[in-house]
Every structure is written in C-alpha cells, then in structure tokens.
Amino acid sequence: MTIGVVGRKCGMTRIFTEEGVSIPVTVIEIEPNRVTQFKTEETDGYRAVQVTVGERRASRVTAAQAGHFAKANVAAGRTVMEFRLEEGEYQAGDQINAEIFAAGQLVDVTGQSKGKGFQGTIKRWNFRGQDNTHGNSVSHRVPGSIGQCQTPGRVFKGKKMSGHMGAERVTVQSLEVVRVDAERNLLLVKGAVPGATGGNLVVRPAAKARG
C-alpha cells in the first residue's frame, strides 16, 4: 500500500528498549486525514485519494474550496494532499490515521526544512576556508574563483555560490517506525525529520522497501 498520511511534527525525545538502549525518536501527530476525493482511472485517468487535515477559518476558505469540501461533507482543512493508490477503495468522508503503519515498518518522511536565510559557501555548500595566515587578508571565507576568463566569459549555471539556504522540500528515506500510539494518534519515528516543530509532514511507506 503506497498511501501515506499528513502529520504535524511535535518535536524529538527518546525512548528506551527493554535492554536499556536509548533510541532518539521524532514524535509526529497524525491528525485524522479526511478523504475529500477519490480519483479513479475511469474519471481521472489514475487512482488516487485526496485528503485534508487540520482546520481553517471560514474566512480563509475560498468559494471554490468551500464547494469542494462541502461536496465531500468534510470540514475545511489547512492543507490538501493527494496520494497515488495501488489498491483499496475510499469514499469521501472516510478518515485515515496512524493505524495504517506498524512498529518496525520503514517510512519516508517529507517536510520543509528550516530556513537559514542568506548564507555563504562554507555553511551552504561545506566549502573549506582559506588560510588564516600566510599572507591571506580579508579572504578567509571567500569562495575563490567562480569561472574562467574571456572564454567562456560567463559563470556556468548551477555554480555553487552564496545564496538563500533552507526552506525547501526535503525527504528523509527509510526511517523506522518505533511505536504507533493509535489512542493519541502519535507516530514515533527513529531519528530526525525535516522542518521545525509544528510543521506539516508527509509520511509514506518507504519507496526503497516496497521492492
């Protein structure tokens, strides 16, 4: 099953195994994912399920969105996400929660990384710094040459330079689900995941573990 869920990052903690081994985990709150639309090959050309999660004030919902949510008979959510579906059937109004995952399962977690603002090449691209002494002056953290001379007479696209860092879509693959708390809708995943506390996360079964 390739379907995933949208969750919210609660932060990190650690849990202990029966042998006393400490495992760092990220706590992800899986709020009920309400199905807003089920797409089929006959009507849409592919199979997918569209879900919404959370809440949004009525004043922030457009007329088109309000009609879409009303047709599915679900409350307006803060975001809408679509998952391709290989098997299974869903109807508008159904709910998907953390119970679709099991302890020991591998998952891919996608989120927006923390924004770092404008950063230089050392922090952004792990460039090495130049000599601190030996005649170097004011050039300790400069990137160095960014191209050739008259030929080609330009800087190539994709050149690693200073610029905005972070605030981009990042996926961490094959993280282990340590524990599933269905009563509190919590998913405990081994290791760190992208983004700040409170940010949206998309949790899917690991692509490299599906065979």
Curated annotation (Swiss-Prot):
**SUPFAM superfamilies with a match to the protein in the record:** Translation proteins
Q: Which UniProt keywords apply?
A: Methylation, Ribonucleoprotein, Ribosomal protein, RNA-binding, rRNA-binding
Instruction: Give GO cellular component annotations, separated by semicolons.
Output: cytosolic large ribosomal subunit
Q: List every position bearing N5-methylglutamine.
A: Q150
Record's InterPro entries? Ribosomal_uL3, Ribosomal_uL3_bac/org-type, Ribosomal_uL3_CS, Transl_B-barrel_sf
- Protein family membership: Belongs to the universal ribosomal protein uL3 family.
Q: Which NCBIfam families does this one have? A: L3_bact
UniProt protein name: Large ribosomal subunit protein uL3
- Species annotation: Pseudomonas syringae pv. tomato (strain ATCC BAA-871 / DC3000)
Upper taxonomic classification of the species? Answer: Bacteria, Pseudomonadati, Pseudomonadota, Gammaproteobacteria, Pseudomonadales
Gene name of the record = rplC
